[in-house]
């Protein structure tokens, strides 16, 4: 499962770096977070990031992620996520940086869902073996 506190730390560390409040450089940040895909997404297309209010975009994107991160996802949930991310993308005029953040966050949700399905399958198999 995705370590939620790690994702929060990545967001906080990136924001500190972006706002110039951190003495940590990009390379140190990458090493600290083992080049995590979420951090790499935040660091990509920074020219595009400069075109939007980064703190607000990050807050709005992260709120979508937080809303769904602990759910056992149903089809309706996935449809809702797609709709919410579409609206955010539209709001920020399809900004490439914003879209990349949304894609990475959805990827994290997909990882969690795949892990939940794998665990459920293993439990089901163990139950069958016990019969």
What are these regions (language model features)?
Residues 1-47, 58-65, 126-131:
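Short terminal alpha-helical segments
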Residues 6, 10, 53, 57-60, ...:
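Residue-level detector of well-ordered alpha-helical segments, enriched
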Residues 14, 18, 42, 46, ...:
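Generic structural signal for hydrophobic core residues of well-folded globular domains
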Residues 33-54, 100-117:
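Repeat-associated, polar segments at repeat-unit boundaries in modular proteins
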Residues 49-56, 67-77, 91-97:
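Short acidic, glycine/proline-enriched loop segments that cap or flank alpha-helices
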Residues 66-70, 116-119:
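Cationic, hydrophobic amphipathic alpha-helical membrane-interacting segments
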Residues 77-131:
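Amphipathic alpha-helical binding modules
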């Amino acid at each position: 499962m995705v370590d939620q506190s790690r994702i929060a730390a990545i967001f906080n560390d990136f924001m500190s770096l972006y706002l110039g409040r951190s003495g940590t450089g990009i390379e140190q940040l990458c090493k600290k977070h083992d080049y995590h895909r979420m951090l790499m997404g935040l660091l990509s297309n920074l020219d595009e990031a400069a075109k939007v209010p980064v703190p607000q975009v990050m807050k709005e994107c992260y709120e979508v992620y937080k809303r769904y991160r602990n759910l056992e996802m149903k089809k309706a949930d996935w449809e809702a996520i797609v709709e919410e991310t579409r609206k955010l993308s539209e709001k920020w005029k399809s900004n490439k940086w914003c879209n990349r953040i949304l894609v990475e966050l959805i990827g994290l949700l997909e990882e969690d869902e795949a892990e939940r399905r794998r665990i459920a399958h293993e439990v089901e198999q163990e139950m069958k073996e016990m019969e």
